[in-house]
């Protein structure tokens, strides 16, 4: 190993700094059509990554020490707050796990890396790693590596938030099928309110501890590119149907509390729930009041 002063200064922090700078240039080129100059810049970025990988392989001849270095770097970065920083670090881990110029990384190295960087972030991490260890026969590509991060952000323990029509790698689709076979028909329905009372609507939502600027359904669903928001579309259609029913009721009587009727017509409302009984009583009173107005 080269023990020169230059090599000694080329530690994990410097490697990470250079990697992030190169990736920033690549992402900038990817966001807009590349002209001749931009295309040349992109090619230079690819060459820079190749050269950086060569330096890494010379610096860390004992490849097992890479995870010690990554852990040291991870403890110094503010990854819990800045997700952009974490995404760059996550890609950097894949880069550091590459060997002999290969574009993919080995299964054992990928599993070790996932357990390092996704601990506390991926609810199905242990099941995922067990599945990969037992079923995967090929090395992990960079695209699959990045898709696993997206999957970890949008899918809950009960697989709510997973879109079977999404552009997931086959490996992730196979994992989901495997999880369905384990979970069976029993779904956790306790996450959804069955009373239909709008004042109790808060039971349908939970605040995300790291993203408190919005409220989201407690399904683990994130607003990320490529994820089809089927649930939101379905809810919008249900709300339109409810609004039409409210307007019809308004034409028959102006004495009703339309908000409560709309609530009781919610698909989440049980036929024997308090709001369902209240709706029947309200309709009965409306009929009586309407009859009483006649001369």
From Swiss-Prot:
Q: Where is this motif: Nuclear localization signal?
A: 214-221
Which intervals hold domain DCUN1?
1-180
User: What are the start and end residues of every segment in region (Disordered)?
Assistant: 214-251
What is the predominant subcellular site recorded for this chain? nucleus
User: Pfam families, from UniProt?
Assistant: Cullin_binding
The protein's location, in the record's own words, is: Nucleus
Report, from the record, the phenotype seen after gene disruption.
Answer: Root growth resistance to the anti-auxin p-chlorophenoxyisobutyric acid (PCIB), which inhibits auxin action by interfering the upstream auxin-signaling events. Also resistant to the auxin analog 2,4-dichlorophenoxyacetic acid (2,4-D) herbicide.
Q: What keywords does the record list, in alphabetical order?
A: Auxin signaling pathway, Nucleus, Ubl conjugation pathway
Composition-biased stretches (Acidic residues): 237-247
One of the GO BP terms on file: auxin-activated signaling pathway
Which GO cellular component terms, listed alphabetically, does the Swiss-Prot or TrEMBL entry include? nucleus
Annotated domain remarks: The DCUN1 domain, also known as PONY domain, mediates the interaction with different cullins.
Q: What does this protein do?
A: May contribute to the neddylation of all cullins by transferring NEDD8 from N-terminally acetylated NEDD8-conjugating E2s enzyme to different cullin C-terminal domain-RBX complexes; neddylation of cullins play an essential role in the regulation of SCF-type complexes activity. Regulates responses to the synthetic auxin 2,4-dichlorophenoxyacetic acid (2,4-D) in roots, probably by modulating the SCF(TIR1) ubiquitin E3 ligase complex-mediated proteolysis.
Q: What is this protein called?
A: Defective in cullin neddylation protein AAR3
